[in-house]
C-alpha cells in the first residue's frame, strides 16, 4: 500500500439491479396465459373425484328420465327406416317427410322404453339385477300379440 492513499474498502459494491422489460403481447398470447397454466397444473395435482360403482350409472339414469329429447340420433334412424321400407316395398324408394320420421321415432322410442321397463321388472322378479335376453322375451310374451308386436 502506498503512503497517503486510502485503504481500499473491504465491501464489494453490488451491481445495479436490472429490471426486465415487459414482454410484448401479441394477438396470439394473452397476458393471463401463465395464470391459466398454473391453474392447469394445480388441477392435475388434485385427484379426480371417484364415484362408487353404480353411482355414475344411477346419475345417468336420472338424467335421461328427466330429459324429453330423442335418444336415438336422427340420421341413423332415418337410414334404418328407409332400409326397412326398401325391403318390404319390393325395392321401391319412397320419400319420407321429416315429421313422419319424427313421429315414427317418437313411437319407437316409447315402445323400447316401455319394453325395457317391463323386462327389467321381469329380471327383478327373478331376483336378479342384470337384464337378460330371456327377460325381454318374457316381457314381449306377456304383452301379447298386439302389444309385443308378434
Curated annotation (Swiss-Prot):
GO cellular component terms listed in the entry, alphabetical order: chromosome, centromeric region; nucleosome; nucleus
Residue numbers spanned by region H3-like: 53-150
Basic residues composition bias: residue spans: 41-53
InterPro entries in the record: Histone-fold, Histone_H2A/H2B/H3, Histone_H3/CENP-A
Keywords: Centromere, Chromosome, DNA-binding, Nucleosome core, Nucleus
Segments of this protein annotated with the region Disordered: 1-55
Keyword DNA-binding: yes
Assembly behavior: Component of centromeric nucleosomes, where DNA is wrapped around a histone octamer core. The octamer contains two molecules each of H2A, H2B, CENPA and H4 assembled in one CENPA-H4 heterotetramer and two H2A-H2B heterodimers. CENPA modulates the DNA-binding characteristics of nucleosomes so that protruding DNA ends have higher flexibility than in nucleosomes containing conventional histone H3.
Functional description taken from the UniProt entry: Histone H3-like nucleosomal protein that is specifically found in centromeric nucleosomes. Replaces conventional H3 in the nucleosome core of centromeric chromatin that serves as an assembly site for the inner kinetochore. The presence of CENPA subtly modifies the nucleosome structure and the way DNA is wrapped around the nucleosome and gives rise to protruding DNA ends that are less well-ordered and rigid compared to nucleosomes containing histone H3. May serve as an epigenetic mark that propagates centromere identity through replication and cell division.
UniProt family annotation: Belongs to the histone H3 family.
Entry protein name: Histone H3-like centromeric protein A
Organism name: Xenopus laevis (African clawed frog)
Gene name of this polypeptide: cenpa
